[in-house]
Amino acid sequence: MGKIIFYEDRNFQGRHYECSSDCADLSPYFSRCNSIRVESDWWVLYEKPNYMGYQYVLTRGEYPDYQRWMGFNDCVRSCRMLPHTGRSYRMRIYERLTFGGQMMEIMDDCPSVYDRFRYRDIHSCQVMDGYWIFYEHPNYRGRQYFMRPGEYRRYSDWGGYSSTVGSLRRIME
């Protein structure tokens, strides 16, 4: 079973809350989050309640301040534990909305979408197998978007504010 511990202050200080399952609203348990310990599994953290806002994908480890998980601020209001996946990863990305335009199939990590495919924008995608993370910038930097199996007809379906995707990687156990 997964476990994550949220701390109000940096360096694992202050009031804390232990969580072992999805939680749509963390605000009753702490007012701010400045450090986190992930004791097991992968977790997706959200800036707002009900799995909305900026997303941060964390694996087992210690994060003594929010910059360590690429956070923009100390606001974490909901979280999801990622279930274990198989060893198969497959996704189709499209240069236009609703699966239009050029299609590329991906089965491995991509540190630079532009270097590999010669375009920066992904307007829609189909995740067939595995869990993935889209990053706003190359080399796995910037805003993160958690991608589970399913169809995403436009970038707003995965929570994106624009169609720009700089890199993407598989979530591997």
Curated annotation (Swiss-Prot):
Which superkingdom heads the taxonomic lineage of this protein's source?
Eukaryota
> Any stretches that span the bilayer, and where are they?
none
Does the entry feature the keyword Phosphoprotein, yes or no? no
State the Gene Ontology BP annotations. Answer: lens development in camera-type eye; visual perception
Is the Protease keyword given for this protein?
no
Write out the entry's keywords from A to Z. Answer: Eye lens protein, Repeat
Residues of the Beta/gamma crystallin 'Greek key' domain: 2-40, 41-83, 89-129, 130-172
Q: List the disulfide bonds.
A: none
**A molecular function (GO) term:** structural constituent of eye lens
Which SUPFAM superfamilies does the annotation name? gamma-Crystallin-like (SSF49695)
Question: Where do the segments described as Connecting peptide lie?
Answer: 84-88
What the record says about family reads: Belongs to the beta/gamma-crystallin family.
Give the protein's biological function.
Crystallins are the dominant structural components of the vertebrate eye lens.
Comment block on domains: Has a two-domain beta-structure, folded into four very similar Greek key motifs.
This protein's name: Gamma-crystallin S-1
